[in-house]
């Protein structure tokens, strides 16, 4: 079963403009209820072209810890809904601590941090 925090290889083509494309790693960010029942899944692209977070929506992942080819960055500004048929193979899964970083970057990407601060 596909779970939130899993890292898969996925085929992201075709793309337009600045979208991440080709077969590349993605992290599952959709909740597990959606993962169980929906034919689609929400993912964030991972790139190995940069190995350091450059903006607040980036999360670094280490190649040794996560068995990747190179140090990489999760791009939480590059979120896509994919048909599950685009997922090729599971590579690894992210730790709870790393998923907290993903959640924080996702909140920034979607502007949810402003909503939280306004309620306080």
UniProtKB/Swiss-Prot annotation:
Q: Which GO terms describe its molecular function?
A: DNA binding; RNA binding; RNA endonuclease activity
Keywords noted in UniProt: Endonuclease, Hydrolase, Nuclease, RNA-binding, Toxin-antitoxin system
Name this polypeptide is given: Endoribonuclease MazF
Q: What is its EC number?
A: 3.1.-.-
- SUPFAM superfamilies assigned: Cell growth inhibitor/plasmid maintenance toxic component (SSF50118)
| Species name | Staphylococcus aureus (strain MRSA252)
The role this protein plays is:
Toxic component of a type II toxin-antitoxin (TA) system. Ribosome-independent, sequence-specific endoribonuclease that cleaves mRNA, thus inhibiting protein synthesis and inducing bacterial stasis. It cuts between the first and nucleotides of 5'-UACAU-3' in single-stranded RNA. Neutralized by coexpression with cognate antitoxin MazE.
Q: Extract the Pfam families matched here.
A: PemK_toxin
Designated gene of the protein? mazF
Q: Which PANTHER family match?
A: ENDORIBONUCLEASE MAZF (PTHR33988:SF2), ENDORIBONUCLEASE MAZF-RELATED (PTHR33988)
Coiled coil: which residue ranges?
A: none
Oligomeric and partner information: Forms a complex with MazE which is no longer active as an endoribonuclease.
**What's this protein's family per the entry?**
Belongs to the PemK/MazF family.
| InterPro entries given in the database record | PemK-like, Plasmid_toxin/cell-grow_inhib
The processes (GO biological process) annotated in the record are: mRNA catabolic process; rRNA catabolic process
Per the record, the domain of life is: Bacteria
């Amino acid at each position: 079963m596909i779970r939130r925090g899993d890292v898969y290889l996925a085929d992201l083509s075709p793309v337009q403009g600045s979208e991440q494309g080709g077969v590349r790693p993605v992290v599952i960010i959709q909740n597990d209820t959606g993962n169980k029942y929906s034919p689609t899944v929400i993912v964030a692209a991972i790139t190995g072209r940069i190995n350091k977070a450059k903006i607040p929506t980036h999360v670094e992942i280490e190649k040794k810890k996560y068995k990747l080819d190179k140090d990489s960055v999760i791009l939480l500004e590059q979120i896509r809904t994919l048909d599950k048929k685009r997922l090729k193979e599971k590579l690894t899964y992210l730790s709870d601590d790393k998923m907290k970083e993903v959640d924080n970057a996702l909140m920034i990407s979607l502007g949810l941090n402003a909503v939280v601060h306004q309620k306080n």
